[in-house]
Amino acid sequence: MKLAIDSGFPNSHAFVTLLKKEYGMLPKEYRREQKKEKQQTSQQLEQHNYIAGLKKYLNDNTHTHVVSPISKKQIDFSVNGSSYVLLHTWKKMMTVGRASDVLICDIQEMLTRFQNRIGFEYIKLCGIFSDDLHVYNEKANGTPVYSFTYIDKILDFVTKLHLNPWIQLSYMPEKLAKYPNKRLFGSNVSQPHSIAAWCRLVSEFLQHISNRYGLEVIRSWKFGLWNQPNTNMDLFGFSNEKDFFQFYKETFLCVKNFCPDIEFSLPPTYYIVSEGYENWYLNFLEWCKQNDCIPDSLSFTYYDTKLISNKNHSKESFGFIYAMSLSESPDGLKDFVMQVLRERRRLNLGKLPIYLSEWNNTPSQQDLLNDTCFKSCYIVKNILENYDRLESFTYQALTDLMADSSLPNMLFFGGLGLFTVNGIPKASYYAYTLLQQLGDQFLGRGDEYFITRENDSFQVMLYNYRHFNYLYANGERFDMTETDRYTVFADSEPVMISLCLSDIPQGNYKISETYVNRTHGSAFDQWVSMGALELTTPQEIDWLKKSSVPGFHQKIVSVNSDEILELDVTLELLEVRLIQITPLH
């Protein structure tokens, strides 16, 4: 009664009536709900109903046709400036998630298609010692039993695709684990109960693949250890930092004693993962210097997120929870790249290779923007802005079909992949097919454009990137729905670009434009236009695959004696467009 009167209600009955109307429950039930701990996991951001409740007060504009204003941009560029050869390091390495995923037939088909289209050099394979590959067992008397049959099948398949394995020595077979119940994503992530037993496993594995493929071949492969050791013990970290340092050193020596020429990388470090772990890899490298085990390369995991540990977690439990928010900055990856390059100089590591062995804007398998044109534009923007600055940019992941967690029973659930679970290419896949067509000579870049040359032809990549709003970055979907996912972009206007290229030799040219936007190349948007029903037959899936390809347009233009080529292009929100300019002889 006191709460009702203090809040301005005439009596408790009026208070209870309004509360039940607004929240659908009585005060006692409401208090019970409020006591439940609301936590966020790294797989899905919490949504706050009080924000969504404001939606009913918005004006209904469903019958109002809103014409988006068009911003204008002028690009003036001479193709006769200085140039240099591109390495295309974004094609250095790809990944499928866990090594065991390569055994899945559907994933093999997607992997084959992607590799045939792009031509990567390496594939990262993590979890090769996980129990699902049955690598390690023991007899009743404790004698170790090794089996590399499933690993052989994985390595045979990827090498037939002309992919060199990048082998991450992980995770821990349960029989070797100090903490048998310390599991994450289906694998044991404990430190070993015996480093000597672990090193025997590594040695047996190295000897096996050397016998099978030849030492000269595996010298061209790359090796690393573990995954994100700078996270808390409740994730991939060890109970004591020094325990991991020693684990690394003994594994490093084991590999180098077998073959000094094998490249052994820094354990993939989750960059600035959480409070208290920002300087982990700097401390680790200093320790390596003092202990003569400096890695041959650096390796990082990067997501445009901030992870904040839950201070109320139990140290006895391995179910550690992180709160997560997305970066509000559109330039997070660029800032990260420049920072690690500065730190490499400061540590006097020379030109020690830096591999981005896993990256995305989110680690979430249920972020609805993953299926949209946002992700294709995000990929293009970040690769072009950071082109060749690191030795690899390994996008996570190939497909939504990832075996480390259960998957929602729907087609577009916000998975990380370039392909849906049934092999439908998303807009993000086609971003890579456009990048693949860039030339080998870099001419220049600027505000949302990138220009290359290949022999007598020129390639111009344009994009209209917009970052999501503050609310979405902090977990509020607000008025986003399963089918309307672009409401989180405050600025949705198209941009009209006037492109003026000078010093183009006189003559006739074929202009070929390939573009990915909401009407071309986006399977999600095509699915929405089809009615957004679940696809129930192979024919429907095949139709969606064939109908959601990039747009394409060609025309012939003439360049006069002034050697100027002018083109006008309009890009929709989050559109990516490749313009190829080819002389006609």
Where are these regions (language model features)?
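Sequence-specific DNA-binding recognition helix
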Residues: 1-33, 53, 58-60
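Acidic-and-aromatic substrate-binding clefts and catalytic sites of carbohydrate-active enzymes
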Residues: 12, 97-109, 143-148, 176, ...
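Non-catalytic accessory regions flanking glycosidase/transglycosidase catalytic cores in CAZymes
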Residues: 14, 33-168, 175, 179, ...
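Active-site beta-loop-alpha junctions enriched in small/polar residues
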Residues: 95-99, 128, 170-172, 226-228, ...
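Short acidic/His/Gly/Ser-rich catalytic and metal-binding motifs that mark active-site loops
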Residues: 131-135, 174-182, 231-234, 305-316, ...
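Active-site-proximal loop/short-helix segments
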Residues: 175-176, 180, 223-231, 274, ...
